[in-house]
UniProtKB/Swiss-Prot annotation:
GO biological process, one term: glycogen biosynthetic process
GO terms of molecular function: 1,4-alpha-glucan branching enzyme activity; cation binding; hydrolase activity, hydrolyzing O-glycosyl compounds
UniProt enzyme class: transferase
Top-level division of the source organism's lineage: Bacteria
Pfam families: Alpha-amylase, Alpha-amylase_C, CBM_48, GlgB_N
Gene expressing this chain: glgB
Stated family: Belongs to the glycosyl hydrolase 13 family. GlgB subfamily.
EC code: 2.4.1.18
Reactions catalysed according to its record: Transfers a segment of a (1->4)-alpha-D-glucan chain to a primary hydroxy group in a similar glucan chain
InterPro entries: A-amylase/branching_C, Branching_enzy, GlgB, GlgB_N, GlgB_N_E_set_prok, Glyco_hydro_13_cat_dom, Glyco_hydro_13_N, Glyco_hydro_b
Swiss-Prot/TrEMBL keywords: Carbohydrate metabolism, Glycogen biosynthesis, Glycogen metabolism, Glycosyltransferase, Transferase
Native source organism of the sequence: Shigella flexneri
UniProt-listed HAMAP family: GlgB (MF_00685)
Name assigned to this protein: 1,4-alpha-glucan branching enzyme GlgB
Length: 728
């Protein structure tokens, strides 16, 4: 019998260096009958069993004391279902042979994966509990075309790479194996001999759950059921909808006071969700929740792109959180990081011993700012991995929007690089053509497959058409963060009011390009870290003036065209920078009514008023929705404009960015009549000085600013007021 199997083959198989285990193991036809071969380290006796009757058909001979067995079942010509009775340490176990099952991946799936056009690669790759030929187990598939051998190791096989070597599908570079008995909740990894002969242990790129750091194994976990998208959630993302986003880092929004430990997904569902709803926000934006090894990356260096982090609970717990947000009327935005990944050796880096997911040349594949690796978007399987991930979060978790991080670093080859540190594209330019095509393709597929879900770009340059359709030469995003507006307005607000007259254009310049993109106005986490100070602490003056400046700024921001985004803590004017290792300073809201309560009430009222009046959001991206009334009064740092809805209804917004009240300030208006003050950031309700206009004011038929009718208002110090025209 030993003549049938070459000794070198047995040695290679046992040593874990044999790349084609199915050519040796399992059931094979021979002239003497059907031969069954098995590699079962530490076994002492093995029989082939008839499953229905339990009858022993043949005892396998031990050809190698390290666990290689073989035996012939005479007079049998056709393959049949069998089991193995194996004696380990004196105990008999009945097992199904993984090597009796045929190929797992269908030819069409293999072709689509190789072409990079499989819309949902996660349905094929990764670990999936399944039943094959009446046997329950898990099918594993991993793309590692340059590996010499790949095995599944885990809790079901003592983490022994000899026991379950996989089949290579050469046409696609995918290794596959069905392991009977492996089930949900068990840990696993892929052990491989890489292209260079080195032994590697890798987490599954397509794992749906993973261990919490510092452990790095993947978990067998069923594919989540699809989430049905509702019409209400679709409408909440549209261009004419009120969108006010509360940006949250789940690990530091609030912590347990006794041990500074995180809240769980379910605790966040019970605390964060009702708070955001009460505050009037329409959307929750989550900093990346993909599994990541380093807390200090805030999730922006993910190693488990398909796995919600276990820091706050299980995959099902995260689904519970999303469901709770939807039940409260909140859409959920997920920060998504397809731009780079960390160098940790258990993850994607040099996955099969080659630069499989990343570029081989560090001038293309290494991000020196973050010590991370850059995806090779030109490789079809890599692009497919990422596009499929976008669909996965939207379809399987009900994520309503993806905010794509660091788009500029993706689309420019020379991003943060000096001359000689980057490689031009094929036309000699600086654009990363493959990344641009990847983004366009992702946005196109999402638009086709999940109507109503949207994408938002954090893009820090003036790359044209980020939020324009692909057929117009754009990238196809629905929205783009307006970082220029954010920088200009914060630069203005930090100035002593006496100097603001010399920088008046920082508040007006944004309208010159406002309709080139569909903008979100962001005051994000990036603006309250790394020595930039908190938003409150950037405001000039004493404590009263700091809070007044902040309130005036928020009133301006909520009225300015564009959707709104505010990072957690800013809604109650946290005074210190954000610390990801600690809770927000909720104690500032303790001990009686104070300035922080005032800002919190203002943000709530801004949200509710903004949502109630269509003029404040319906035409954000249409020039008809905005008109300057006073734009050139730089000496007094006064700016006045109107917001307008589709029916022509107007809201007047007036800001005074000096501490000097402006009494009897007259300006021309479009619509005469009685105007009611609906919001005043200087109200005593917000701990202001309570200057204002007594509720209502009537227009005069006095020409001003080129208009026949005008209003005469009191403009409170360091304040913004909103007025709506009363019906006759």
């Amino acid at each position: 019998m030993s003549d049938r199997i070459d000794r070198d083959v047995i040695n290679a198989l046992i040593a874990g260096h044999f790349a084609d285990p199915f050519s040796v193991l399992g059931m094979h036809k021979t002239t003497a009958g059907l031969e069954v071969r098995a590699l079962l380290p530490d076994a002492t006796d093995v029989w082939v069993i008839e499953p229905k009757t339990g009858r022993k058909l043949a005892k396998l001979e031990c050809l190698d004391s390290r666990g290689f067995f073989s035996g012939v079942i005479p007079r049998r010509k056709n393959f049949f279902r069998y089991q193995l009775a194996v004696v380990w340490h004196g105990q008999q176990n009945l097992i199904d042979d993984p090597y009796r099952f045929g190929p797992l991946i269908q030819e069409m799936d293999a072709w689509l994966l190789s072409e990079g056009t499989h819309l949902r690669p996660y349905e094929t790759l990764g670990a999936h509990a399944d039943t094959m030929d009446g046997v329950t187990g898990t099918r594993f598939s991993v793309w590692a075309p340059n590996a010499r051998r790949v095995s599944v190791v885990g809790q079901f096989n003592y983490w022994d790479g000899r026991r379950h070597p996989m089949r290579l599908r050469k046409e696609s570079g995918i290794w596959e194996l069905f392991i009977p008995g492996a089930h949900n909740g068990q840990l696993y990894k892929y052990e491989m001999i890489d292209a260079n002969g080195n032994l590697r242990l890798k987490s599954d790129p397509y794992a749906f759950e993973a261990q919490m750091r510092p452990e790095t194994a993947s978990l067998i976990c069923g594919l989540p059921e699809k989430v049905v998208q509702t019409e209400e959630r679709k409408k909440a993302n549209q261009f004419d909808a009120p969108i006010s986003i509360y940006e949250v880092h789940l690990g530091s929004w609030r912590r347990h006071t006794d041990n500074n430990f995180w809240l769980s997904y379910r605790e966040l569902a019970d605390q964060l969700v009702p708070y955001a709803k009460w505050m009037g926000f329409t959307h929750l934006e989550l900093l990346p929740i993909n599994e990541h090894p380093f807390d200090g990356s805030w999730g922006y260096q993910p190693t488990g792109l398909y796995a919600p982090t276990r820091r706050f609970g299980t995959r099902d717990d995260f689904r519970y959180f999303i469901d709770a947000a939807h039940a409260a009327g909140l859409n959920v935005i997920l920060d998504w990081v397809p731009g780079h990944f960390p160098t940790d050796d258990f993850a994607l880096a040099e996955f099969d011993g080659t630069n499989l997911y990343e570029h081989s040349d560090p001038r293309e594949g290494y991000h020196q700012d973050w010590n991370t690796l850059i995806y090779n978007y030109g490789r079809r399987e890599v692009s497919n991995f990422l596009v499929g991930n976008a669909l996965y979060w939207i379809e399987r978790f009900g994520i309503d929007a993806l905010r794509v991080d660091a788009v500029a670093s993706m689309i420019y080859r020379d991003y943060s690089r000096k001359e000689g540190e980057w490689i031009p594209n094929e036309f000699g330019g600086r654009e990363n053509l493959e990344a641009i095509e990847f983004l366009r393709n992702t946005n196109r597929i999402l638009g086709e497959q999940v109507s109503g879900a949207v994408t938002m770009a954090e893009e820090s340059t003036d790359f044209p058409g980020v939020s324009r359709p692909q057929d117009m030469g754009g990238l196809g995003f629905w929205y783009k963060w307006n970082l220029g507006w954010m920088h200009d307005t914060l630069d203005y607000m930090k100035l002593d009011p006496i100097y603001r007259q010399y920088h008046h254009d920082k508040l007006t310049f944004g309208m010159l390009y406002n309709y080139t993109e569909n903008f979100v106005l962001p005051l994000s986490h990036d603006e309250v870290v790394h020595g930039k100070k908190s938003i409150l602490d950037r405001m000039p003056g004493d404590a009263w003036q700091k809070f007044a400046n902040l309130r005036a700024y928020y009133g301006w921001m909520w009225a300015f065209p564009g959707k709104k985004l505010l990072f957690m803590g800013n809604e109650f004017a946290q005074g210190r920078e954000w610390n990801h290792d600690a809770s927000l300073d909720w104690h500032l809201l303790e001990g009686g009514d104070n300035w922080h309560h005032g800002v919190q009430r203002l943000v709530r009222d801004l949200n509710l008023t903004y949502r109630h009046h269509k003029a404040m959001h319906e035409l954000d991206f249409d020039p008809y929705g905005f008109e300057w009334l006073v734009v050139d009064d730089k000496e007094r740092s006064v700016l006045i404009f109107v917001r307008r809805d589709k029916e022509g209804n107007e809201i007047i917004v007036a800001s005074n960015f000096t501490p000097v009240p402006r009494h009897d300030y007259r300006f021309g208006i479009n619509q005469p009549g009685k105007w009611r003050e609906i919001l005043n950031t200087d109200s005593i309700h917000y701990h202001g000085s309570n200057a204002g206009n007594g509720g209502t004011v009537h227009s005069d038929e006095i020409a001003s600013h080129g208009r026949q009718h005008s209003l005469s208002l009191t403009l409170p110090p360091l304040a913004t007021i909103w007025l709506v025209r009363e019906a006759e």
